Amino acid sequence: MTDKFIELTLDGYKQTAGGEFGGLVPGWFTDEPQVVVTDRHAIRWTPDLFDAFRARWGYDLTPHLVSLWEEVGPWRQVRHNYRDVLMNLFLDRFMKVCHAYCERNELAFTGHFWEHGWPDMAHNPDNMAMYAWQQMPGIDLLYNKFDLDSPNAHFGNVRSVKEVNSAANQTGRVRKLSESYGGAGWDVTLRDLKRLGDWEYALGVNFMNQHIAPLSIAGARKYDYPPTFTPHSPWWEYYRELNMHFARLSLALSSGGQYNDVLVLEPTTSIWMYYTQHAPRRNHWRTMGAQFQEFITALERQQVEFDLGSENIILNHGSVRGDRFIVGKRAYGTVVLPAQMENVDAATFALLRRFAAKGGRIICYGAPRYVDGVPSAEAESFFADAAQVTRADASEPVDAALYASSEIAFDLAQGNCLFHHRRRMDDGQVLFLVIYFAVSYTHLRAHETDQY
Protein backbone atom coordinates (compact mmCIF):
# COMPACT_ATOMS: atom_id res chain seq x y z
CA MET A 1 0.00 0.00 0.00
CA THR A 2 2.85 2.40 0.80
CA ASP A 3 4.42 1.71 -2.60
CA LYS A 4 1.15 2.59 -4.34
CA PHE A 5 0.80 5.73 -2.22
CA ILE A 6 4.30 6.84 -3.24
CA GLU A 7 3.58 6.01 -6.87
CA LEU A 8 0.45 8.19 -6.88
CA THR A 9 1.99 11.11 -5.00
CA LEU A 10 5.76 11.47 -4.97
CA ASP A 11 6.31 9.87 -8.34
CA GLY A 12 3.76 12.30 -9.73
CA TYR A 13 5.68 15.21 -8.25
CA LYS A 14 8.87 13.68 -9.59
CA GLN A 15 7.54 13.82 -13.15
CA THR A 16 6.98 17.57 -12.91
CA ALA A 17 9.57 18.73 -10.37
CA GLY A 18 12.04 15.86 -10.06
CA GLY A 19 14.85 18.08 -11.27
CA GLU A 20 14.41 20.17 -8.12
CA PHE A 21 14.53 17.21 -5.70
CA GLY A 22 17.28 17.84 -3.18
CA GLY A 23 17.34 21.54 -4.09
CA LEU A 24 14.28 23.74 -4.36
CA VAL A 25 12.30 20.71 -3.16
CA PRO A 26 14.42 19.64 -0.18
CA GLY A 27 12.14 17.07 1.40
CA TRP A 28 8.86 15.30 1.96
CA PHE A 29 6.67 16.34 4.89
CA THR A 30 4.29 13.78 6.39
CA ASP A 31 1.57 14.79 8.83
CA GLU A 32 0.44 12.46 11.62
CA PRO A 33 0.66 8.96 10.08
CA GLN A 34 -0.69 6.55 12.69
CA VAL A 35 -2.20 3.12 13.31
CA VAL A 36 -5.16 4.22 15.45
CA VAL A 37 -8.52 2.49 15.05
CA THR A 38 -11.82 4.36 14.79
CA ASP A 39 -13.31 2.51 17.75
CA ARG A 40 -11.19 3.28 20.79
CA HIS A 41 -12.08 -0.09 22.32
CA ALA A 42 -10.99 -2.06 19.25
CA ILE A 43 -7.50 -3.21 18.32
CA ARG A 44 -5.50 -2.69 15.17
CA TRP A 45 -5.71 -5.62 12.75
CA THR A 46 -4.10 -6.34 9.40
CA PRO A 47 -4.65 -9.45 7.23
CA ASP A 48 -1.35 -11.10 8.16
CA LEU A 49 -1.27 -9.96 11.79
CA PHE A 50 -1.46 -13.47 13.21
CA ASP A 51 1.22 -14.79 10.85
CA ALA A 52 3.51 -11.87 11.69
CA PHE A 53 2.91 -12.40 15.40
CA ARG A 54 3.76 -16.10 15.24
CA ALA A 55 6.87 -15.41 13.16
CA ARG A 56 8.07 -12.82 15.69
CA TRP A 57 7.17 -14.50 18.97
CA GLY A 58 6.69 -18.19 18.18
CA TYR A 59 3.14 -18.65 19.45
CA ASP A 60 -0.41 -18.08 18.25
CA LEU A 61 -2.06 -14.82 19.26
CA THR A 62 -5.60 -16.05 18.52
CA PRO A 63 -6.33 -17.85 21.83
CA HIS A 64 -4.82 -14.93 23.74
CA LEU A 65 -6.82 -12.10 22.14
CA VAL A 66 -8.86 -11.62 25.30
CA SER A 67 -5.61 -10.72 27.11
CA LEU A 68 -5.46 -7.49 25.09
CA TRP A 69 -8.52 -6.32 27.03
CA GLU A 70 -8.68 -8.38 30.22
CA GLU A 71 -6.03 -9.27 32.78
CA VAL A 72 -6.23 -12.99 32.11
CA GLY A 73 -3.53 -15.44 31.09
CA PRO A 74 -0.06 -14.03 30.36
CA TRP A 75 -1.62 -10.65 29.61
CA ARG A 76 1.50 -8.54 30.16
CA GLN A 77 3.48 -10.70 27.75
CA VAL A 78 0.70 -10.74 25.14
CA ARG A 79 0.20 -6.97 25.22
CA HIS A 80 3.93 -6.31 25.05
CA ASN A 81 4.40 -8.73 22.16
CA TYR A 82 1.38 -7.38 20.27
CA ARG A 83 2.58 -3.75 20.43
CA ASP A 84 6.05 -4.86 19.38
CA VAL A 85 4.60 -6.52 16.28
CA LEU A 86 2.51 -3.45 15.42
CA MET A 87 5.55 -1.22 15.76
CA ASN A 88 7.69 -3.38 13.50
CA LEU A 89 4.97 -3.69 10.87
CA PHE A 90 4.60 0.12 10.88
CA LEU A 91 8.36 0.54 10.60
CA ASP A 92 8.85 -2.07 7.88
CA ARG A 93 5.85 -1.19 5.74
CA PHE A 94 5.80 2.58 6.01
CA MET A 95 8.78 4.24 7.65
CA LYS A 96 11.57 2.23 6.01
CA VAL A 97 9.90 2.43 2.60
CA CYS A 98 9.56 6.22 2.84
CA HIS A 99 13.11 6.57 4.15
CA ALA A 100 14.52 4.51 1.28
CA TYR A 101 12.60 6.49 -1.35
CA CYS A 102 13.94 9.75 0.06
CA GLU A 103 17.49 8.39 0.14
CA ARG A 104 17.26 7.40 -3.52
CA ASN A 105 15.84 10.78 -4.53
CA GLU A 106 18.00 13.10 -2.38
CA LEU A 107 15.03 14.14 -0.26
CA ALA A 108 14.76 14.59 3.50
CA PHE A 109 11.88 12.59 4.95
CA THR A 110 10.40 14.83 7.65
CA GLY A 111 7.11 15.78 9.29
CA HIS A 112 5.66 14.43 12.50
CA PHE A 113 3.52 11.72 14.08
CA TRP A 114 1.05 11.77 16.99
CA GLU A 115 3.84 12.22 19.49
CA HIS A 116 1.73 14.07 22.04
CA GLY A 117 -0.43 11.02 22.66
CA TRP A 118 2.25 9.17 24.67
CA PRO A 119 1.76 7.15 26.88
CA ASP A 120 -1.38 6.31 24.89
CA MET A 121 -0.17 3.69 22.41
CA ALA A 122 -3.23 3.78 20.13
CA HIS A 123 -1.62 6.00 17.49
CA ASN A 124 1.99 4.89 17.56
CA PRO A 125 3.73 2.19 19.63
CA ASP A 126 7.07 4.08 19.88
CA ASN A 127 7.69 7.68 18.77
CA MET A 128 11.47 7.47 18.84
CA ALA A 129 11.55 4.32 16.72
CA MET A 130 9.82 6.32 13.98
CA TYR A 131 12.30 9.22 14.17
CA ALA A 132 15.20 6.87 13.47
CA TRP A 133 13.89 6.50 9.91
CA GLN A 134 13.59 10.20 9.09
CA GLN A 135 16.39 12.18 7.49
CA MET A 136 15.03 15.22 9.38
CA PRO A 137 13.02 13.98 12.36
CA GLY A 138 10.20 16.27 13.39
CA ILE A 139 7.44 17.10 15.87
CA ASP A 140 4.70 19.67 16.13
CA LEU A 141 4.10 22.16 18.93
CA LEU A 142 0.71 23.84 18.91
CA TYR A 143 -1.14 26.61 20.76
CA ASN A 144 0.06 29.43 22.99
CA LYS A 145 0.08 27.63 26.30
CA PHE A 146 3.11 26.54 28.30
CA ASP A 147 2.53 23.35 30.31
CA LEU A 148 5.38 21.48 31.99
CA ASP A 149 3.18 18.87 33.64
CA SER A 150 1.00 17.02 31.16
CA PRO A 151 2.48 14.20 29.04
CA ASN A 152 0.10 15.37 26.30
CA ALA A 153 1.06 19.05 26.38
CA HIS A 154 2.64 20.85 23.44
CA PHE A 155 4.85 23.76 24.51
CA GLY A 156 6.42 22.77 27.81
CA ASN A 157 6.42 19.06 26.96
CA VAL A 158 10.02 18.13 27.73
CA ARG A 159 9.54 14.51 26.70
CA SER A 160 8.23 15.30 23.23
CA VAL A 161 11.18 17.50 22.25
CA LYS A 162 13.78 15.35 24.02
CA GLU A 163 12.56 12.30 22.11
CA VAL A 164 13.16 13.83 18.70
CA ASN A 165 16.43 15.47 19.77
CA SER A 166 17.77 12.24 21.30
CA ALA A 167 16.88 10.11 18.29
CA ALA A 168 18.61 12.65 16.04
CA ASN A 169 21.73 12.64 18.22
CA GLN A 170 21.86 8.85 18.16
CA THR A 171 21.28 8.47 14.41
CA GLY A 172 23.55 11.34 13.38
CA ARG A 173 20.83 13.65 12.09
CA VAL A 174 21.69 17.34 12.38
CA ARG A 175 18.40 19.14 11.73
CA LYS A 176 15.28 18.64 13.85
CA LEU A 177 12.03 20.17 12.64
CA SER A 178 9.14 21.61 14.59
CA GLU A 179 5.82 22.54 13.03
CA SER A 180 5.21 25.46 15.38
CA TYR A 181 2.48 27.85 16.50
CA GLY A 182 -0.61 26.25 14.94
CA GLY A 183 -3.67 27.18 16.98
CA ALA A 184 -1.84 29.93 18.89
CA GLY A 185 -4.65 32.27 17.85
CA TRP A 186 -5.10 35.51 15.98
CA ASP A 187 -4.09 37.42 19.10
CA VAL A 188 -0.64 35.82 19.43
CA THR A 189 2.17 38.38 19.67
CA LEU A 190 5.77 38.42 18.51
CA ARG A 191 6.76 38.18 22.16
CA ASP A 192 4.75 34.96 22.45
CA LEU A 193 6.31 33.55 19.29
CA LYS A 194 9.82 34.25 20.56
CA ARG A 195 9.09 32.87 24.03
CA LEU A 196 7.75 29.60 22.68
CA GLY A 197 10.37 29.25 19.97
CA ASP A 198 13.29 29.90 22.31
CA TRP A 199 12.05 27.16 24.64
CA GLU A 200 11.82 24.49 21.94
CA TYR A 201 15.25 25.48 20.60
CA ALA A 202 16.74 25.04 24.07
CA LEU A 203 15.39 21.48 24.06
CA GLY A 204 16.84 20.62 20.65
CA VAL A 205 14.74 21.95 17.76
CA ASN A 206 16.80 23.79 15.12
CA PHE A 207 14.53 23.96 12.06
CA MET A 208 11.29 25.92 12.43
CA ASN A 209 8.31 25.16 10.19
CA GLN A 210 5.66 27.77 10.94
CA HIS A 211 1.99 26.84 10.70
CA ILE A 212 0.43 28.23 8.41
CA ALA A 213 0.64 30.50 5.32
CA PRO A 214 -2.56 30.32 3.22
CA LEU A 215 -3.02 32.45 0.11
CA SER A 216 -6.44 33.45 1.40
CA ILE A 217 -8.28 33.45 4.73
CA ALA A 218 -11.71 33.68 3.14
CA GLY A 219 -14.48 31.60 4.65
CA ALA A 220 -13.53 28.70 6.88
CA ARG A 221 -9.82 29.23 6.21
CA LYS A 222 -9.66 31.87 8.92
CA TYR A 223 -10.46 29.14 11.46
CA ASP A 224 -7.71 26.76 10.29
CA TYR A 225 -5.54 26.88 13.40
CA PRO A 226 -4.46 30.53 13.15
CA PRO A 227 -2.33 32.61 13.15
CA THR A 228 -1.21 32.89 9.55
CA PHE A 229 2.34 33.86 8.67
CA THR A 230 1.20 36.19 5.91
CA PRO A 231 0.28 39.89 5.57
CA HIS A 232 -3.06 39.03 7.19
CA SER A 233 -1.36 39.16 10.61
CA PRO A 234 -0.90 42.66 12.11
CA TRP A 235 2.76 42.09 13.03
CA TRP A 236 3.74 40.85 9.56
CA GLU A 237 5.92 43.84 8.64
CA TYR A 238 8.06 43.22 11.75
CA TYR A 239 8.20 39.44 11.47
CA ARG A 240 11.50 39.51 9.60
CA GLU A 241 13.30 40.60 12.79
CA LEU A 242 12.10 37.54 14.67
CA ASN A 243 13.01 35.30 11.74
CA MET A 244 16.54 36.69 11.78
CA HIS A 245 16.80 35.72 15.44
CA PHE A 246 15.75 32.14 14.75
CA ALA A 247 17.92 31.95 11.63
CA ARG A 248 21.00 32.79 13.71
CA LEU A 249 19.89 30.42 16.44
CA SER A 250 19.28 27.63 13.93
CA LEU A 251 22.81 28.01 12.61
CA ALA A 252 24.37 28.07 16.07
CA LEU A 253 22.39 25.06 17.31
CA SER A 254 23.12 23.05 14.16
CA SER A 255 26.86 23.51 14.52
CA GLY A 256 29.08 20.97 16.21
CA GLY A 257 27.26 18.36 18.24
CA GLN A 258 25.46 17.82 21.52
CA TYR A 259 27.13 15.03 23.50
CA ASN A 260 25.23 14.10 26.64
CA ASP A 261 26.73 11.61 29.08
CA VAL A 262 23.46 10.35 30.58
CA LEU A 263 20.96 8.04 28.86
CA VAL A 264 17.47 7.78 30.39
CA LEU A 265 15.58 4.75 29.14
CA GLU A 266 12.01 5.54 28.17
CA PRO A 267 9.55 3.03 29.72
CA THR A 268 7.59 2.55 26.52
CA THR A 269 7.82 -1.26 26.48
CA SER A 270 6.74 -1.31 30.13
CA ILE A 271 3.64 0.70 29.27
CA TRP A 272 2.92 -1.77 26.45
CA MET A 273 2.34 -4.42 29.13
CA TYR A 274 -0.44 -2.40 30.73
CA TYR A 275 -1.93 -0.67 27.72
CA THR A 276 -5.67 -1.06 27.32
CA GLN A 277 -8.57 1.30 26.72
CA HIS A 278 -10.67 -0.77 29.10
CA ALA A 279 -11.57 1.63 31.93
CA PRO A 280 -10.59 1.87 34.74
CA ARG A 281 -7.48 -0.22 34.02
CA ARG A 282 -6.13 2.47 31.72
CA ASN A 283 -5.50 4.64 34.78
CA HIS A 284 -2.36 2.61 35.53
CA TRP A 285 -0.50 3.36 32.30
CA ARG A 286 -1.65 6.97 32.42
CA THR A 287 -0.12 7.27 35.90
CA MET A 288 3.11 5.69 34.66
CA GLY A 289 3.28 8.26 31.85
CA ALA A 290 2.61 11.19 34.17
CA GLN A 291 5.26 10.03 36.64
CA PHE A 292 7.87 9.61 33.92
CA GLN A 293 7.02 13.05 32.55
CA GLU A 294 7.53 14.54 36.01
CA PHE A 295 10.86 12.74 36.40
CA ILE A 296 12.49 13.87 33.15
CA THR A 297 11.10 17.40 33.52
CA ALA A 298 12.78 17.56 36.93
CA LEU A 299 16.05 16.40 35.35
CA GLU A 300 15.79 19.06 32.66
CA ARG A 301 14.97 21.81 35.16
CA GLN A 302 18.04 20.80 37.17
CA GLN A 303 20.19 21.15 34.03
CA VAL A 304 21.05 17.45 33.81
CA GLU A 305 22.38 16.80 30.31
CA PHE A 306 20.71 13.62 29.06
CA ASP A 307 19.26 11.82 26.07
CA LEU A 308 16.26 9.53 26.07
CA GLY A 309 16.63 5.93 24.95
CA SER A 310 14.20 3.89 22.84
CA GLU A 311 14.65 0.15 23.21
CA ASN A 312 14.01 -0.27 19.49
CA ILE A 313 16.82 2.13 18.61
CA ILE A 314 19.03 0.36 21.16
CA LEU A 315 18.18 -2.97 19.50
CA ASN A 316 19.32 -1.67 16.12
CA HIS A 317 22.17 0.63 17.14
CA GLY A 318 23.23 -0.43 20.64
CA SER A 319 26.55 -1.88 21.79
CA VAL A 320 29.05 -1.63 24.64
CA ARG A 321 32.55 -0.26 24.16
CA GLY A 322 34.64 -0.36 27.30
CA ASP A 323 32.67 1.40 30.03
CA ARG A 324 30.51 3.29 27.51
CA PHE A 325 26.97 2.37 26.50
CA ILE A 326 26.79 3.05 22.76
CA VAL A 327 23.63 4.03 20.92
CA GLY A 328 24.52 4.78 17.32
CA LYS A 329 26.58 7.98 17.20
CA ARG A 330 26.51 8.60 20.96
CA ALA A 331 28.32 7.07 23.93
CA TYR A 332 27.01 7.28 27.49
CA GLY A 333 28.75 6.79 30.81
CA THR A 334 25.52 6.56 32.83
CA VAL A 335 22.28 4.72 32.02
CA VAL A 336 19.18 5.54 34.07
CA LEU A 337 16.20 3.24 34.54
CA PRO A 338 13.22 5.27 35.82
CA ALA A 339 10.80 3.88 38.38
CA GLN A 340 8.29 3.09 35.64
CA MET A 341 10.73 0.73 33.92
CA GLU A 342 9.17 -2.60 34.90
CA ASN A 343 10.21 -4.31 31.66
CA VAL A 344 13.38 -4.41 29.62
CA ASP A 345 13.57 -6.08 26.25
CA ALA A 346 16.01 -8.96 25.90
CA ALA A 347 18.50 -7.00 23.79
CA THR A 348 18.49 -4.09 26.26
CA PHE A 349 19.00 -6.43 29.21
CA ALA A 350 21.95 -8.17 27.55
CA LEU A 351 23.65 -4.83 26.84
CA LEU A 352 23.04 -3.54 30.37
CA ARG A 353 24.68 -6.64 31.84
CA ARG A 354 27.72 -6.22 29.60
CA PHE A 355 27.83 -2.51 30.44
CA ALA A 356 27.81 -3.22 34.18
CA ALA A 357 30.50 -5.89 33.79
CA LYS A 358 32.74 -3.33 32.05
CA GLY A 359 32.32 -0.83 34.88
CA GLY A 360 29.50 1.22 33.38
CA ARG A 361 27.23 3.11 35.74
CA ILE A 362 23.54 2.16 36.00
CA ILE A 363 21.17 4.20 38.16
CA CYS A 364 17.98 2.31 38.92
CA TYR A 365 14.91 3.98 40.44
CA GLY A 366 12.72 0.90 40.10
CA ALA A 367 13.01 -2.85 39.97
CA PRO A 368 12.55 -4.23 36.44
CA ARG A 369 11.32 -7.79 36.73
CA TYR A 370 10.10 -8.58 33.23
CA VAL A 371 12.02 -9.30 30.03
CA ASP A 372 9.95 -9.04 26.84
CA GLY A 373 6.88 -9.03 29.07
CA VAL A 374 7.79 -12.33 30.77
CA PRO A 375 8.63 -12.52 34.52
CA SER A 376 12.40 -12.89 34.90
CA ALA A 377 14.11 -13.86 38.14
CA GLU A 378 17.41 -13.14 36.41
CA ALA A 379 16.43 -9.53 35.73
CA GLU A 380 15.01 -9.08 39.21
CA SER A 381 18.25 -10.35 40.76
CA PHE A 382 20.48 -8.23 38.53
CA PHE A 383 18.71 -4.94 39.16
CA ALA A 384 18.58 -5.59 42.91
CA ASP A 385 22.34 -6.21 43.10
CA ALA A 386 24.05 -3.18 44.64
CA ALA A 387 27.32 -4.29 43.09
CA GLN A 388 25.80 -3.95 39.62
CA VAL A 389 23.56 -0.89 39.93
CA THR A 390 23.24 2.30 41.94
CA ARG A 391 19.87 2.37 43.66
CA ALA A 392 17.95 5.67 43.79
CA ASP A 393 14.76 6.51 45.66
CA ALA A 394 11.94 7.51 43.32
CA SER A 395 9.93 8.94 46.21
CA GLU A 396 12.57 11.61 46.85
CA PRO A 397 13.20 14.73 44.74
CA VAL A 398 15.69 14.22 41.93
CA ASP A 399 19.23 14.47 43.29
CA ALA A 400 21.17 16.43 40.66
CA ALA A 401 24.42 15.46 42.40
CA LEU A 402 24.02 11.96 40.94
CA TYR A 403 24.50 13.49 37.51
CA ALA A 404 27.09 16.17 38.26
CA SER A 405 29.27 17.13 35.30
CA SER A 406 32.90 18.18 35.49
CA GLU A 407 32.39 20.41 32.45
CA ILE A 408 29.55 22.70 33.52
CA ALA A 409 27.57 23.48 36.67
CA PHE A 410 24.68 25.77 37.55
CA ASP A 411 23.93 27.33 40.92
CA LEU A 412 20.29 28.37 40.90
CA ALA A 413 17.75 29.65 43.35
CA GLN A 414 14.75 27.56 44.27
CA GLY A 415 11.87 27.78 41.84
CA ASN A 416 14.09 28.11 38.78
CA CYS A 417 12.93 27.20 35.33
CA LEU A 418 16.15 27.41 33.37
CA PHE A 419 16.59 25.36 30.21
CA HIS A 420 19.83 25.08 28.30
CA HIS A 421 21.43 23.53 25.23
CA ARG A 422 25.19 22.99 24.98
CA ARG A 423 27.05 22.06 21.81
CA ARG A 424 30.70 21.24 21.31
CA MET A 425 32.82 22.21 18.33
CA ASP A 426 36.47 21.74 17.49
CA ASP A 427 37.34 25.26 18.65
CA GLY A 428 34.92 25.76 21.54
CA GLN A 429 31.36 25.40 22.74
CA VAL A 430 27.98 27.10 22.35
CA LEU A 431 25.65 27.45 25.33
CA PHE A 432 22.07 28.63 24.83
CA LEU A 433 20.06 29.56 27.95
CA VAL A 434 16.32 30.15 28.31
CA ILE A 435 14.78 31.25 31.62
CA TYR A 436 11.05 30.80 31.94
CA PHE A 437 10.20 31.93 35.43
CA ALA A 438 11.80 34.52 37.68
CA VAL A 439 14.77 33.41 39.73
CA SER A 440 16.34 35.38 42.54
CA TYR A 441 19.81 34.80 41.14
CA THR A 442 21.59 32.77 38.52
CA HIS A 443 25.27 31.92 38.57
CA LEU A 444 27.00 29.91 35.87
CA ARG A 445 30.35 28.18 36.29
CA ALA A 446 32.08 26.92 33.17
CA HIS A 447 35.58 26.65 31.82
CA GLU A 448 37.14 29.18 29.43
CA THR A 449 33.89 30.68 28.16
CA ASP A 450 33.27 33.71 25.99
CA GLN A 451 29.93 35.48 26.48
CA TYR A 452 28.05 37.15 23.64
Q: Where are the regions that the model predicts?
A:
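N-terminal low-complexity segments that are often proline-rich with Ser/Thr-Pro
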Residues: D450-Y452
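Carbohydrate-binding surfaces of carbohydrate-active enzymes
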Residues: Q15-G27, E32-E448
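Catalytic and substrate-binding clefts that recognize carbohydrates or anionic sugar/phosphate headgroups
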Residues: M1-G19
